[in-house]
Design a protein with these regions (language model features):
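C-terminal leucine-rich, beta-strand-based interaction scaffolds used for sensing/assembly
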Residues: 1-106, 117
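Amphipathic alpha-helical elements of HEAT/ARM-like alpha-solenoid repeat scaffolds that form extended
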Residues: 46-65, 85-111, 120-162, 169-204, ...
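HEAT/HEAT-like alpha-solenoid repeats
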Residues: 79-80, 204, 208
Length: 233
């Protein structure tokens, strides 16, 4: 891990990962040599990847409730400071959306609501199986995929379907989100197929509420993927 000296913009590589993890905690949490919120806000726009890695180390490596609480409080400070600047807040939200899951879903709901509806007949698409894991480029869909196996799974799926109603032209990306990212994986059996049940549940609910050809086609494709007996992950 590279620790970045924000003041002088110099980097030092520390080879021992355990010591590196300890040093991050010692500097930013124990001694608070530099306020963690300052490191996050300034470091994020210097080296986003390394800043996120440092925060993840504090949240995931150290099983300390006080550390977790402090880190989340510091991220909240940056969140509040940046949220009125769309240019800076958007990339920050994409990196730290799970710190404020409810607020993130509200923001995405507002975004989807403001999106103009686009007319598109999904039936005109020649479905290609090799596109089932199409790369997702849409930021809203990417973030919603991150809510798999969380307390907000159902809400995230519901928003994906609302987005699909507005943007059927994003069929492949939304199909990929539901069938692949929310699909069967190595943890599904242990979790009682909770995520996949929520996908089917929300699809059925959407169809019952407003049955359209586009929704039916999405349901058919997702169901076909779920009914496969093998999976790759």
């Amino acid at each position: 891990l590279e620790l970045v000296d924000l003041r002088y913009d110099k980097a030092a590589r520390i080879s021992d990962q355990s010591f590196s993890n300890y040093l991050i905690k010692y500097v930013f949490v124990d001694q608070k040599v530099i306020p963690l919120s300052k490191m996050i806000e300034e470091g994020f726009f210097i080296n986003q990847e390394r800043t996120v890695v440092a925060c993840n180390i504090l949240l995931q490596v150290f099983a300390d409730e006080n550390v977790h609480k402090y880190v989340k409080e510091q991220i909240d400070i940056v969140w509040n400071h940046l949220k009125n600047s769309k240019e800076k807040f958007t990339p920050f939200l994409k990196a730290f959306y799970l710190i404020r899951p409810t607020e993130t879903l509200v923001l995405l709901s507002d975004f989807i609501e403001s999106e103009p509806a686009r007319m598109f007949d999904v039936g005109t698409i020649k479905f290609e199986k090799n596109k089932s894991e199409k790369n997702i480029e849409d930021d809203a869909i990417k973030i919603l995929c991150g809510f798999k196996a969380t307390q907000q799974t159902s809400e995230a799926i519901e928003l994906l379907l609302l987005y699909y109603k507005k943007r059927p032209d994003l069929f492949y990306e939304i199909y990929s989100a539901l069938a692949v990212h929310f699909g069967v994986d190595i943890d599904s059996e242990r979790q009682g197929y909770f995520v996949q049940e929520r996908v089917v549940e929300q699809l059925c609910k959407a169809i019952e509420s407003n049955q359209t050809t586009n929704l039916l086609l999405l349901f058919i494709r997702v169901a076909a993927q779920f009914l496969k007996l093998s999976f790759s992950r």
